[in-house]
Structures are given as structure tokens and as C-alpha cells.
A protein has these predicted regions:
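Canonical Radical SAM [4Fe-4S] cluster-binding loop centered on the CxxxCxxC motif
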Residues: 52-87, 180
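C-terminal scaffold of the Radical SAM
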Residues: 46, 76-99, 106-401, 455, ...
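A short, conserved structural fragment
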Residues: 415-425
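Short amphipathic alpha-helical interaction segments
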Residues: 400-413
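Short, amphipathic alpha-helical interaction segments positioned at domain boundaries
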Residues: 434-460
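Short, cationic-aromatic polyanion-contact patches
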Residues: 182, 306, 427-444
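Flexible, acidic/Gly-rich N-terminal and inter-domain linker regions that tether
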Residues: 1-54, 103
Length: 460
């Protein structure tokens, strides 16, 4: 079966390396400061000429409480008044960007991320969605994939009703862990009842899909405690579930310095949590999509993987990878054709630049032919666990074995170790290699070296 996983502890220990999650290739680590607003506007014109469908990502950076594990770009504040000045600059960015696209380009996908998007008041959410509808071709028939990240502590039934009214049909809930001791250790107190209430509201209001995020490897977690959390989440029957590995990088993310290393689970316990979780989810009928994602068989991700159309971008696994992605807001990333661009990550600088009527594009890169080739290889492996050489050769005008000749001994070693099946026609990731597909993809990453690896989490 496509979703089958074989647990091999020895292989996992050998290939559990630090490396990218490949929501893009090249990864954001390679972005440079030579990319600016002109590059973005030129790419938008090309998108308009090609009439490509669009995906919008809006970043709302505010959180009322700090979660010690968090590595997101965020602003911690209880001052709700800080949202309005940011919203005004976000609206200005929307206005500028909209001049360079065709109003007939449909917005097939929309995602509000953060931070905590529901930090915005109901009136502010209404205002923002109205502004988007004025300047972009948002779909009115509920056929779009319109999602928002929700902190169950910051939402209630009225919030959910408003979101459904505004056109959102998918929600993603941050849960991470339901054990009170773990929650205290990461400063995120959230009851099962709060989470259940939001899931029930989503079902009653006919949201199309509910996703729940969990993290293993947090302080005070044990295999037994985390198994209880997974069981409680399974009982809520989310359509999708993300199971992230906590990466403790306190030298990069200041909030993580409040976590004591002594409270973190051992590598053996982390492996046990992952193994137990996979077994629990599999028994409950969830399919392994890849990396850290699971979905019910009738979910669009599972169907797309079955049909060979699943893709991956900055929003994770997606059925809309064919869309040009426009990122709006502080630190937001766009992927338009062969251009990656990112807005300023400092909120004060972002707001000042937009206040002057200019886009806040600060960095990015243009993909070359080699980038496009390697991106296609990584995309195929990470989404479908297989690669047909002929498809890549036809699309990119090369001979796979010759182009990647230097990698062949390493690929043969992966074959001997049981991670892949390397044949004359392609690569098939075996069940024992699916949890380690990132390690396979790293072979094709020409930018990766030991110094770069230190900036990423481990595979498991």
C-alpha cells in the first residue's frame, strides 16, 4: 500500500539526520538580499500573462501568550490595539499587489497563518476579508480551499460562525499536547474541552476539513502520556493530523531558552512516541501522507496522493501546488513561477515600508535550470515515494544516470540498506524508508552542507 510504513529502528538511528523539510527547493536558507519589489512585480506580470490560478497566504503575527517551543515569526502582546496599524499596512500591500494581477485569476487557495490569526477582532476579520474580495477573485461557491489557523483558546462558537460566514471552509487547530504537565512546561494551557468545542463547532457549521497539530519531543513528555494525547485527538476524528518533531534550537529561538534540556525526553523515548503514534493512527484508519502528515482515506490529500497529483509548497502538502503563491504580511514568502521572494521579517520595518507606499520585499532567489530539476526530483519523492527517470528526463532534457552520476554510490547504499529500490527505470521508496524520505531528498540538495544542516531539525 502507498501509505504503508515499516518501522526499522536501526535504519532510523543511522539516517536520522538534520535537514530541511523541503516546503521549497532551494530552501529559504539560500535566499539573498539581491531580490526586491521589482523582481516580485515582474513575476506577477508573468503570472498574469499566463493566467495562472493563485494561492494567497496572509501572515498575522500576533499572539497573546508565548509558547516556549515556538519557532514562528510572531509578536507577543496583549494589546489588541496593535492589530489595526498592521491591518492597515496589510491592506496597502493587498492594493499594490492587486494592480499587477488579472482580476480573472481565481484564488483557489487562501490561508491565514501566524502567530494567531484569531487574535484579530471579528470586525477586523470582516474588514480584511472584505478588502481581499474587493481586490482579488475570491470564489463564492465554497469550491476554494480557504483555511485558517486557530488557537482554541482564542475562539468560540461565534468566532467559528463568523469564519464560516466569511468563506473559510477548513481550520487547523494548534494543540501540540493535551497533558497538563507538558502544557505547563511549554506555557500553553489548553483543555481538551476547549479543543473539542471548536471541533464540534466546525462539524456543525459544515467546515470541510479539520486539521490538528501535535508535537512530540516536548519537555515532560513520556511515551505513555503522549499516547493518551494521541488517543484523545483520534477520538475527535480530525480529517488531517500533523505530528511534528520538536527541534530544540535555543541558540536560534529565544523562547526555547526557557525549556530545560533536562526536561526533554530521551532519543529512545522520542522514537517510542513516534512509533506508538504511527501505530495508533494507522489502527484508527489514518493514512500516512508523508513526513509528518496523516489523513483519513476520503480526505483530499489522501485522494491526491492516490491519483499522483499531490504537491508540496510553503503551506505543506497541498492539492494546489499548480497555483502561484502570493505571501502577504510580515515575513510572508511568495513562490511565483521560478521566483521565491520574502517580505521583511521585522514588523516595524514592514509597516514603515508599506506606510511609504512601497512593497516590503527583502530577499529571495530566482531558480535556475538545476534548481528546477532538483526541485522536481525532491517534490516527486517527498509526495509520492517514487520517481520515474523517464518523466524527469523528458521534462528537463537530461539523462538522469549521467546527471546524478556522483550520487549513484550513495543511492546504491540506500538500496542495500533497504530504504529504496534503485532500478533501471527509477527509484521506489520502500516502506522502511518512508519515514526517512527527507534523508533521501538531501542527497539531491546541492546547497546542503554541515553548516547549513545545523539550522534544521532532525528527520525523526
Amino acid at each position: 500500500m502507498l501509505d504503508a510504513i515499516q518501522w526499522d529502528a536501526d535504519l532510523i538511528r543511522r539516517y536520522d539526520l538534520a535537514g530541511p523539510r523541503y516546503t521549497s527547493y532551494p530552501t529559504a536558507v539560500q535566499f539573498h538580499d539581491d531580490i526586491g519589489p521589482f523582481d516580485l512585480l515582474h513575476a506577477l506580470r508573468d503570472s498574469r500573462k499566463a493566467r495562472r490560478p493563485l494561492s494567497l497566504y496572509l501572515h498575522v503575527p500576533f499572539c497573546a501568550h508565548i509558547c516556549y517551543y515556538c519557532a514562528c515569526n510572531k509578536v507577543i502582546t496583549k494589546d489588541r490595539g496593535r492589530a489595526l496599524p498592521y491591518l492597515e499596512k496589510l491592506e496597502r500591500e493587498i492594493e499594490i499587489i492587486s494592480r499587477y494581477i488579472d482580476r480573472n485569476q481565481p484564488i483557489e487557495q487562501l490561508h491565514f497563518g501566524g502567530g494567531t490569526p484569531t487574535f484579530l477582532s471579528h470586525d477586523e476579520l470582516r474588514r480584511l476579508m472584505q478588502h481581499l474580495r474587493q481586490h482579488f477573485n475570491l470564489l463564492d461557491d465554497d469550491s476554494g480551499d480557504y483555511s485558517i489557523e486557530i488557537d482554541p483558546r482564542e475562539a468560540d462558537w461565534s468566532t467559528m460562525g463568523l469564519l464560516r460566514e466569511l468563506g473559510f471552509n477548513r481550520v487547523s487547530l494548534g494543540v501540540q499536547d493535551l497533558d497538563p504537565e507538558v502544557q505547563r512546561a511549554v506555557n500553553r494551557l489548553q483543555t481538551l474541552e476547549e479543543t473539542r468545542a471548536i471541533v464540534e463547532a466546525a462539524r456543525t457549521l459544515q467546515f470541510r476539513s479539520v486539521n490538528i497539530d501535535l508535537i512530540y519531543g516536548l519537555p515532560k513528555q513520556t511515551p505513555e502520556r503522549f499516547a493518551r494525547t494521541v488517543a484523545e485527538v483520534i477520538a475527535l476524528q480530525p480529517d488531517r493530523l500533523s505530528l511534528f518533531n520538536y527541534a530544540h534550537l535555543p541558540e536560534r529561538f529565544m523562547p526555547q531558552r526557557r525549556i530545560s534540556v533536562d526536561d526533554l525526553p530521551s532519543p529512545a523515548d522520542k522514537l517510542a512516541m513516534l512509533q506508538n503514534s504511527i501505530e495508533q493512527l494507522t489502527r484508527a484508519g489514518y493514512r500516512y501522507i508523508g513526513m509528518d502528515h496523516f489523513a483519513l482515506p476520503d480526505d483530499e490529500l489522501a485522494i491526491a496522493q492516490e491519483e499522483g497529483t499531490l504537491q508540496r509548497n510553503f503551506q505543506g502538502y497541498t492539492t494546489h501546488g499548480h497555483c502561484d503563491l502570493i505571501g502577504l504580511g510580515v515575513s510572508a514568502i511568495s513562490q511565483i513561477g521560478d521566483l521565491y521572494s520574502q517580505n521583511d521579517s521585522d514588523i516595524a520595518s514592514y509597516q514603515q515600508t508599506l506606510g511609504n507606499g512601497q512593497l516590503a520585499t527583502r530577499r529571495g532567489l530566482h531558480c535556475n535550470a538545476d534548481d528546477r530539476l532538483r526541485r522536481a526530483v525532491i517534490q516527486q519523492l517527498i509526495c509520492h515515494f517514487e520517481l520515474r527517470f523517464a518523466d524527469i528526463e523528458q521534462a528537463h532534457g537530461m539523462v538522469f544516470r549521467d546527471y546524478f552520476a556522483a550520487l549513484w554510490p550513495q543511492l546504491q547504499q540506500l538500496d542495500r540498506d533497504g530504504l529504496i529500490e534503485l532500478g533501471a527505470e527509477g527509484i521506489q521508496v520502500r516502506p522502511a524508508g518512508r519515514l526517512l524520505v527527507r534523508s533521501l531528498c538531501m542527497l539531491f540538495d546541492r546547497y546542503l552542507n554541515d553548516q547549513v544542516r545545523q539550522r534544521f531539525s532532525r528527520v525523526i
